[in-house]
From Swiss-Prot:
Chain spans, region G5: 193-195
Region (G3): 90-93
Principal EC category: hydrolase
EC numbers on record: 3.6.5.3
GO CC term (a single one): cytoplasm
Positions of the UniProt region annotated as G2: 69-73
Positions of region (G4): 152-155
Function in brief: GTP hydrolase that promotes the GTP-dependent binding of aminoacyl-tRNA to the A-site of ribosomes during protein biosynthesis.
Family statement: Belongs to the TRAFAC class translation factor GTPase superfamily. Classic translation factor GTPase family. EF-Tu/EF-1A subfamily.
CDD domains named in the record: EF1_alpha (cd01883), EF1_alpha_II (cd03693), EF1_alpha_III (cd03705)
Name the UniProt record assigns to this protein: Elongation factor 1-alpha
SUPFAM superfamilies reported for this sequence: EF-Tu/eEF-1alpha/eIF2-gamma C-terminal domain (SSF50465), P-loop containing nucleoside triphosphate hydrolases (SSF52540), Translation proteins (SSF50447)
Length: 435
């Protein structure tokens, strides 16, 4: 495991804009992929006559290895730059990608948004149905302020490597981001050609008009997030394994506090108590884990069937909050008609996804000022900002956003789409017995 500081990175963007190729390029140039795997991917791509697809094949190979593998794969995808050690969480291309992005984004420290500059592709991504738009909105909700936009496929613009097209995309995407509250002075743009690696790890000979940093240099300008070590322990569980000869091994990322070997811990909402026998990250044993660490930990006294993805770990003297009801400030991002009391979307918060019923529309807010514009509105429609109360249908752990940001921001999904996004301003706790 590298001694460099570690950052979690997510790669987002519209389908077919070149996410896999970009990730493959980074991993090949700076990653931990052995030559053999690269050769196999190249041969598989050649057989199909798709030389340029070798990166996507490479990722598929890694994904298969991951799915077949018995190892707890927190290795995800790793690469190093001069300054940092990166883990790419959730390689793209999943049909559950938005769902994964919601849970993944809540663990990410930074994002690369891949946008194709090719005529028609860029426009599709920015259309109302487009994922470029959807992912920008979700990145904002999930608190991802560190964003690098890789404007890809610059070799396919008309004419190729067209500076005018690049500038037009930078302007439009920046404008859209500003409308959702991004500080675009902090967003970085770079024109790239992923298969060839132009402006990714080396300067492009084809775009002399661009003299800014490469993607890799931008990655080194990212900032490390503050580590909330002095806050109470919170670890949203991503997966639970039962490993023969070892026992129960939950996997997740420490969001706040410190977990030490020997600690007594509680899993909420189940209320199950166990003791930490060992902790590891990227196959390296550790005595303690801090915020930002992706870990697997072996627990004595808890069985795999007792706990699941979406549970949250804390210490018994300050257990994670189970919500009877919670109040949130939401923005309705998409809805064909209107939503009223009783509406029940699926709430995706940290690694959990639970249906929650709207129990009260408290007020509608003026989006510009945040002041109350209407008390107890009858319904909400697309574009509305409101204070709403939700009642979870099944036990759910959430926290106030200002106390534990990663456990207090969420997305509302329905009909396969993101309906809204929000942050939790208040939680009415449910009584749970800790046993």
């Amino acid at each position: 495991m590298s001694q460099k500081p570690h950052l979690n990175l997510i790669v987002i963007g519209h389908i077919d804009h070149g996410k896999s190729t970009l990730v493959g390029r980074l991993l090949m140039d700076r990653g931990f992929i052995d030559e053999k795997t690269v050769k196999e991917a190249e041969e598989a791509a050649k057989k199909l006559g798709k030389e340029s697809e070798k990166f996507a094949f490479l990722l598929d190979r890694l994904k298969e290895e991951r799915e077949r593998g018995v190892t707890i794969n927190l290795t995800f995808m790793r690469f190093e730059t001069k300054k940092y050690f990166f883990t790419i969480i959730d390689a793209p291309g999943h049909r559950d990608f938005v769902k994964n992005m919601i849970t993944g984004a809540s663990q990410a420290d930074a994002a690369i948004l891949v946008v194709s500059a090719k005529k028609g592709e860029y426009e599709a991504g920015m259309s109302v149905e487009g994922q470029t738009r959807e992912h920008i909105i979700l990145a904002k909700t999930m608190g991802l302020d560190q964003l690098i936009v890789a404007v890809n496929k610059m070799d396919l613009t008309e004419p190729p490597y067209d500076e005018k097209r690049y500038k037009e995309i930078v302007d439009q995407v920046s404008k859209f981001m500003r409308s959702y509250g991004f500080n675009t002075n902090k967003v970085r743009f770079v024109p790239v050609v992923a298969p060839a690696g132009d402006n990714i790890t080396h300067r492009s000979e084809n775009m002399k008009w661009y003299n800014g940093p490469t993607l890799e240099e931008y990655l080194d300008q990212l900032e490390l997030p503050p580590k909330p070590v002095d806050k109470p322990l919170r670890i949203p569980i991503q997966d639970v394994y039962s490993i023969s000869g070892v026992g129960t091994v939950p996997v997740g990322r420490v969001e706040s506090g410190v977990l030490k070997v020997g600690d007594k811990i509680v899993f909420m909402p189940a209320g199950k108590v166990g003791e930490v026998r060992s902790i590891e990250t990227h196959h390296t044993k550790m005595d303690k884990a801090e915020p930002g660490d992706n870990i697997g930990f072996n627990v004595r006294g808890v069985e795999k069937k007792d706990i699941k993805r979406g549970d949250v770990v804390g210490h018994p003297n300050n257990p994670p909050t189970v919500a009877d009801e919670f109040t949130a400030r939401i923005i309705v991002v998409w809805h064909p008609t209107a939503l009223a009391n009783g509406y029940t979307p699926v709430i995706h918060v940290h690694t959990a996804s639970v249906a929650c019923r709207v129990s009260e529309l408290v007020s509608k807010l003026d989006p510009r000022t945040g002041q109350e514009a209407e008390k107890n509105p009858q319904f909400l429609k697309q574009g509305d900002v409101a204070i709403v109360k939700f009642k979870p249908i099944k036990p759910l752990c959430v926290e106030k956003y200002n106390e534990f940001p990663p456990l207090g921001r969420f997305a509302m999904r329905d009909m396969g789409k993101t309906v809204g996004v929000g942050i939790i301003v208040d939680v009415k706790p449910a009584k749970v017995e800790i046993k």
